[in-house]
Amino acid sequence: MPRYVPLLLLLLLLRCSERGGGVNFGEKDAKVPGTWRDGVRVPGEGASWDSDRASPERRYGIVGLSQSISTKHPETSPKDSRIRENDVTADGRTTEDHITADPGTTEDSVTADPGTTEDNVTVDPGTTEGSVTADPATTKDYVSADPGTTKDSVTADPGTTENFVTADPGTTKDSITADPRTTEDSVTADPGTTKHSITVDPGTTEDSVTADPGTTKHSITADPGTTEDSVTADPGTTEDETTKHGDTHLL
């Protein structure tokens, strides 16, 4: 249905109410509000749509409404010179088949509410679409280590170097400090002692050998506190055999 049809009906009802009458919209007895005779409209006079008769009746109609009569009555025949079918002489203020829309309204046009854009979404303040703002002091996908700790790094205990073992106090890794009066690789030979035998005081250095009579070359007599790689051999003991005395340990 065209958009102007409801408006046309509304105007028709308003005109009818102003003149104190109405228009009959029946199928068989519908009345036309006015009759045109020789191009001049006769107010309040209409014709019946009945096919058998066309008696004029007093009706109040709308100025400018066209008349279309199809009847067999000779007086209202389209050939009658006094009645012109579909001939409308409009008043100066009325245009045939023309509808003036209400002021401020455009046909088929929608005015959006002020401040609103069609199909547009305004993001809440402080929020970026498709974006996440991390909490303060936090970096995305990043972990801050505890104070004093480096990422993927291990801080050794005080006095300890990473991947390094510090020996007990007084002991150096793979190193032996000889006591005073003892020189490394010095040899004091007892009677009957094989060459390269070493007599050591307590705290004997590495690779020092004290040979007893009859001891095989490179045998070691370790006093308490003897360092690593020392061997204490009894008389008749072969090389690489260890006899423990007291708290002596073979390292």
Curated annotation (Swiss-Prot):
Signal peptide positions on this chain: 1-22
Highest taxon of the lineage: Eukaryota
UniProt keyword Repeat present: yes
Ranges of biased composition (kind: Basic and acidic residues): 72-87, 241-251
Glycosylation sites: N120
Chief localisation class: secreted
Entry's transmembrane regions: none
Compositionally biased tracts (Polar residues): 150-164
Subcellular localization, as worded in the UniProt entry: Secreted
Region span, Disordered: 36-55, 65-251
Tissue distribution: Detected in the brain, lung, spleen, thymus and prostate.
UniProt keyword list: Glycoprotein, Repeat, Secreted, Signal
Record carries keyword Cytoplasm: no
GO cellular component: extracellular region
Region (15 X 11 AA approximate repeats): 153-251
InterPro entries for this protein: EZH_Inhibitor
Protein name: Protein PBMUCL2
Organism: Homo sapiens
Lineage summary: Eukaryota, Metazoa, Chordata, Craniata, Vertebrata
